[in-house]
């Protein structure tokens, strides 16, 4: 007889929870709610404290504080009880003495400031005398709102010298600079780990870290800007174009967006290859982010002998970087993957946040003057004044709490738990005509080249929806459902904001270069996001993403469309082949014929596109919501992760006039490290077929798309990253 299975220790855990309570095991499965998840992190931290020789039960620890922060908005009774229990402990228990908190699955307290080490002030005293001779020559470079930074003459650029300041003297902002400021407050991690949980389930933990550079915004003001990217400036007459008008209004803000919502931020190419080849489904689990090792520097410029210019960089211990997290999703949602402005895809290369801006309502009146020639046709675009009915102007300062970080500080977002539907990582080859049982054959073939015969169509059994016809054929048989759908392609919607293209669900390519008619997505991107670093010129690199043939249930090369309604078995002249002309087109497109989006339609999520594709998206706040989004495969059923904003606090000079239209600022910039943890839940793909399946792999064939040289650096470090296949393995839909 087999020994009984060992049960996990539950401890004193109330009903409905797995970890909220003392004495339980750390392997109880998935937490039941966010409070239980916080309790699991708390238990893991306690376990690490005990292993390091410390007693967290008698002392108040950072893990206790983190649990308080994570349960402050708890709606469940257990989370509320635990929250107030540890608040009481904080009031009476002594603080746990520790130099560094043991590593756990959680995050540290937001905005906690590290005390500067004593050697900083020693360095300041030593450097003060060295810089005394330079102080009289230093001139503070100022910037005015809406003006460019003063730049030296490019003709003497080769004579410029840039160096760091010696030691740590006082900078223009009153802070201390130079010489080893602060203490490291985090780790730099870009690994992807796989934890196999049993029953085919896998927990994928993607770590990502980047060094970010944040400069001063051109202005400290919010600006409502009207954009005209065309030959005519102002509100004049515009020549007819190809729906390329960029006219709109936007609110430009002095803030920047730290956006990690792209596959290339989290996975290296080999991880993507492993996941696509090995996993059957994928779903988002949780996200946490952290900013640490903040360094704020000021720049002063002095003139040496002749025209030699010297820039001096000083660490500023009192200047600050402002951080805001829109955890309630109040502000306009602007995912940066759609403009290729997420964090860069190369962990060893510094990157920058994206300037934050959002659309603003703009009343417009379009009138067209027709002409026999395209050149003579003109469109008059009249832009009206803002309307009270639709105007929405948001400021971050009035909407969100803002944390001020100085050199050495850190900020954490806490853990966000996703609520999304799983994504299949396999594709389907089955169309409607591959559903249900097949007709029986009369005789088996007698040779490998022979074909089989079916029973005469008038003698077959089965159901059809054709009246007064006794035939039962493959074309006439009823099927359980419709696989795949499309919307009319090449359609432009128009409203007060102007025309825009209707999203199209991807299908396979019908003919030639006709990608857009079947929902192919065009990506334009720069060197931070996969463009060849050796490429010259300003034009971005581009590629077109086509879904795998029949991934949406349509394979035009192997199917046909019949005229409707069907009353008799169709003649050849009633069958539309892909070579037939429809509506003046030289090739056949299903989207010219019908729109099959209805209650009988079954269809997959859009492809996850590596590396440039967006991962998750925000659900539209309307009563009737779309069943999918074209731009991302995961749609959050509640609020998505809050947008993370950063902004350098204005570093003012002594020349400040509150009534002036300009603000005199010390030239300041910041570097800081960003770190994130994105967790997924995946299901291993079972091996079912006799034949080997198609896999994503590389080769050494010259000019091959999957030539491994694409993902290897050159002698000077140049490289680029092309998109990798997704959903390579087929699965049975029915």
Swiss-Prot record:
Residues 1-42, 95-116, 134-154 are annotated as: Disordered. Mg(2+) binds at residue 328. It comes from the Viruses. It is found in: Virion; Host nucleus. One of its GO terms (molecular function) is structural molecule activity. Residues 1-10 have a biased composition (Basic residues). Residues 25-35, 97-107, 140-153 have a biased composition (Polar residues). Gene3D superfamilies: Parvovirus coat protein VP1/VP2. Pfam families: Parvo_coat (PF00740), Phospholip_A2_4 (PF08398). One of its GO terms (biological process) is clathrin-dependent endocytosis of virus by host cell. Residues 19-64 are annotated as: Phospholipase A2-like. A motif (Nuclear localization signal) lies at residues 4-13. One of its GO terms (cellular component) is host cell nucleus. Capsid protein self-assembles to form an icosahedral capsid with a T=1 symmetry, about 22 nm in diameter, and consisting of 60 copies of two size variants of the capsid proteins, VP1 and VP2, which differ by the presence of an N-terminal extension in the minor protein VP1. The capsid encapsulates the genomic ssDNA. Capsid proteins are responsible for the attachment to host cell receptors. This attachment induces virion internalization predominantly through clathrin-dependent endocytosis. This is Capsid protein VP1. It comes from Hamster parvovirus H1. The lineage of its organism: Viruses, Monodnaviria, Shotokuvirae, Cossaviricota, Quintoviricetes.
């Amino acid at each position: 007889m087999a020994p009984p299975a060992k049960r996990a220790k539950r401890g004193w855990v109330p009903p409905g929870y797995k970890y909220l309570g003392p004495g339980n095991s750390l392997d109880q499965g998935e937490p039941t709610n966010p409070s239980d998840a916080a309790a699991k992190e708390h238990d893991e931290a306690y376990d690490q404290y005990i292993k390091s020789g410390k007693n967290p039960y008698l002392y108040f620890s950072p893990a206790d504080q983190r649990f308080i922060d994570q349960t402050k908005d708890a709606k469940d009774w257990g989370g509320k009880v635990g929250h107030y229990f540890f608040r009481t402990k904080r009031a009476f228990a002594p603080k746990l003495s520790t130099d560094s908190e043991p590593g756990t699955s959680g995050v540290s307290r937001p905005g906690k400031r590290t005390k500067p080490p004593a050697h900083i002030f020693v360095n300041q005293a030593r450097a003060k005398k060295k810089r005394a001779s330079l102080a009289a020559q230093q001139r503070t470079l100022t910037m005015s709102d809406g003006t460019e930074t003063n730049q030296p003459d490019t003709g003497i650029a080769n004579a410029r010298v840039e160096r760091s300041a010696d030691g740590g003297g006082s900078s223009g902002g009153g802070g201390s600079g130079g010489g080893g400021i602060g203490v490291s407050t985090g780790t730099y991690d870009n690994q992807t780990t796989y934890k196999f949980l049993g029953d085919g389930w896998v927990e994928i933990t993607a770590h990502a870290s980047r060094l970010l550079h944040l400069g001063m915004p051109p202005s400290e003001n919010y600006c409502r800007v009207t954009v005209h990217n065309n030959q005519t400036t102002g509100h004049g007459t515009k020549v007819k174009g190809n729906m390329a008008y960029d006219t709109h209004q936007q609110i430009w803000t002095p803030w920047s967006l730290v956006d990690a919502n792209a596959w290339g931020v989290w996975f290296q190419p080999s991880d993507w290859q492993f996941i696509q080849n090995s996993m059957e489904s994928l779903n988002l689990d949780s996200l946490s982010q952290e900013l640490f090792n903040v360094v704020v520097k000021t720049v002063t410029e002095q003139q040496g002998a002749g025209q030699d210019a010297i820039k001096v960089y000083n660490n500023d211990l009192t200047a600050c970087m402002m951080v805001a997290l829109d955890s309630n999703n109040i502000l306009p949602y602007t995912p940066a993957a759609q403009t290729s402005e997420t964090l860069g895809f190369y962990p060893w290369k510094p990157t920058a946040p994206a300037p934050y801006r959002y659309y603003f309502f703009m009343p417009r009146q379009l009138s067209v003057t027709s002409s026999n020639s395209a050149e003579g046709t003109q469109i008059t675009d009249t832009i009206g004044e803002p309307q009270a009915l639709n105007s929405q102007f948001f400021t971050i300062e009035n909407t969100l709490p803002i944390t001020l970080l100085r050199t050495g500080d850190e900020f954490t977002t806490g853990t966000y738990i996703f609520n999304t539907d799983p994504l299949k990582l396999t594709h389907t080859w089955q169309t409607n005509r591959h559903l249900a049982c097949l007709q029986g054959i009369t005789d088996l073939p007698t040779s490998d080249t022979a074909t089989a015969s079916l029973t005469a169509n008038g003698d077959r059994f089965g159901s059809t929806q054709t009246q007064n016809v006794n035939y039962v054929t493959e074309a006439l048989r009823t099927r359980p459902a419709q696989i795949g759908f499309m919307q009319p392609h090449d359609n432009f919607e128009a409203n007060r904001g102007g025309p825009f293209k209707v999203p199209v669900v991807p299908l396979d390519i019908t003919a030639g270069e006709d990608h857009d008619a079947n929902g192919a997505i065009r990506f334009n991107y720069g060197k931070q996001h996969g463009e060849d670093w050796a490429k010259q010129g300003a034009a971005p690199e581009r590629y077109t993403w086509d879904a795998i043939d029949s991934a949406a249930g349509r394979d035009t090369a192997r199917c046909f469309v019949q005229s409707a309604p069907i009353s008799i078995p169709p003649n050849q002249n009633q069958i539309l082949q892909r070579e037939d002309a429809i509506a003046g087109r030289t090739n056949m497109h299903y989207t010219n014929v019908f729109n099959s989006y209805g209650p009988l339609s079954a269809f997959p999520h859009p492809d996850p596109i590596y590396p440039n594709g967006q991962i998750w998206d925000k659900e539209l706040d309307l009563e009737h919501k779309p069943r999918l989004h074209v731009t991302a495969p995961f749609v959050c059923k509640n609020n998505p992760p809050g947008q993370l904003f950063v902004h350098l606090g204005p570093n003012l000079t002594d020349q400040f006039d509150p009534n002036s239209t300009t603000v005199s600022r010390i030239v300041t910039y910041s570097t800081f490290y960003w770190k994130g943890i994105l967790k997924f839940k995946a299901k291993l793909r079972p091996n079912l077929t006799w034949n080997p399946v198609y896999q994503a792999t590389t080769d050494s064939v010259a000019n091959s798309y999957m030539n491994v040289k694409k993902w290897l650096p050159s002698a000077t470090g140049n490289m680029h990253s092309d998109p990798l296949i997704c959903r390579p393995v087929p699965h049975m839909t029915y």
